[in-house]
């Protein structure tokens, strides 16, 4: 099976399509433009035909075409990711010792910081003030919606869809 997927651009008014990742013979996908329009962030793999290869987070500079891997030092898969509104950081989920916490990588320095720890986060987003909204579950606690401040503190549960069930049934 061929797992070589590429990123392409197509002019809105028609014209030639352009392959952006032809040199990588492994998987490239999940492209997201930066809010300032300067970059395209995407997930990539390096080993052709090896579907279990680690997913990395990479950037394409739209002006120069230069490609940069941001998560070279991160020893796990990069899952879902989102740009910060100022295009300086990318937040992403990545597995880490049995959890899936929220990380932040700086586009210039490539420094990775853990923002929300010890959580099996399945989805996340944030508002204009930088407050996070995410779902996570744990043993005995089905998926619920939580919020926290921009630095990952002041966590608060905001959905209680399974509260009655949790009180009636031991779901451990």
Segments from the language model and where they lie:
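Residue-level detector of Asp-centered blade-edge/turn motifs that repeat once per structural unit
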Residues: 35-36, 85-86, 127-129
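A flexible loop/linker signature enriched in serine peptidases of the S9 family
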Residues: 1-6, 19-29, 43-58, 69-79, ...
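Loop/turn-rich, solvent-exposed surfaces of beta-rich toroidal or solenoidal domains
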Residues: 82-87, 92
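Hydrophobic beta-strand positions that form the internal "hydrophobic ladder"
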Residues: 37-40, 90, 131-133
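Non-catalytic accessory segments flanking enzyme active sites
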Residues: 1, 7, 112-172
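Short loop/turn segments that connect beta-strands within beta-propeller blades
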Residues: 11-15, 61-65, 106-110, 149-153
